[in-house]
Design a protein with these regions (language model features):
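Low-complexity, acidic/polar, glycine-enriched regions of mature
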Residues: 23-201
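Bacterial N-terminal signal peptides
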Residues: 9-20
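Acidic/proline-rich low-complexity IDRs
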Residues: 2-3, 17, 68
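Bacterial N-terminal signal peptides that target proteins for export
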Residues: 1-11
Length: 201
């Protein structure tokens, strides 16, 4: 299971933050084009409150992230995420079986979770608001994503354009048919995404 540290902030599920050591809007070092996630440097984790006793972190081990970057006009950029639902890893085989069952993600009938962006707006602090459609268990609802850039550069060893991203966002799981045991198990779910994305060759 690929885990990150716990997610700060309030309710978060799918909000993508692309965070920057330099200017968040500075793509001058990389060209426009399609960028694909490096699976060896990428994480998608979610967190929720359990009875007020703990804040478990669950992760997905298989997913694709693509970004059609317009480096000259970043607000024209498009982002797509596809998660293999059955790749969820709770750290427990027993809990994995439970959460992939019909009561929760029902992965036999719902093999993928998807997010497709529809609009990107720049913020004064250098982040971006990304609005798009999140589909979970055949339910599609709009979600706003907050986006920043960690770095955009030519990778020092691979000599290829790369963009580093961090992501946070939030939903109420009950809005997507995942409301079992609420409010004892928190309805608000947090997500953190970290990913390095290389230009497609």
């Amino acid at each position: 299971m690929k885990l990150l540290t716990s997610v700060p902030g309030s309710c978060v599920f799918v909000s993508v933050v692309l965070s920057s050591a330099v200017s968040a809007a500075d793509f001058s070092a990389v060209p426009s084009g399609k960028y694909l996630v490096d699976p060896t440097h990428a994480y998608i984790n979610m967190q929720y409150n359990h009875l007020g006793l703990s804040n478990p972190i669950l992760g997905f081990d298989e997913f694709k992230i693509s970004m059609d970057l317009d480096s000259a006009s970043p607000t024209n950029t498009k982002v797509n995420v596809e998660i293999v639902t059955d790749s969820i890893d709770t750290g427990s085989d027993i809990f994995n079986e439970h959460i992939t069952g019909e009561k929760w993600f029902d992965t036999a009938k719902n093999p993928a979770i998807t997010f497709t962006s529809s609009e990107v707006a720049a913020n004064s602090d250098g982040t971006f608001n990304v609005t798009g459609d999140l589909t979970v268990k055949e339910v599609t609802k709009p979600v706003m994503l907050v986006v920043t850039i960690n770095n955009a550069m030519i990778h020092p060893s691979k000599k290829s354009p790369v963009v580093g991203i961090s992501a946070v966002g939030g939903i109420k799981r009950s809005d997507w048919g995942l409301g079992a045991n609420a409010p004892f198990v928190g309805d608000e779910v947090k997500l953190e995404i970290q990913a390095e994305m290389f230009i497609a060759e």
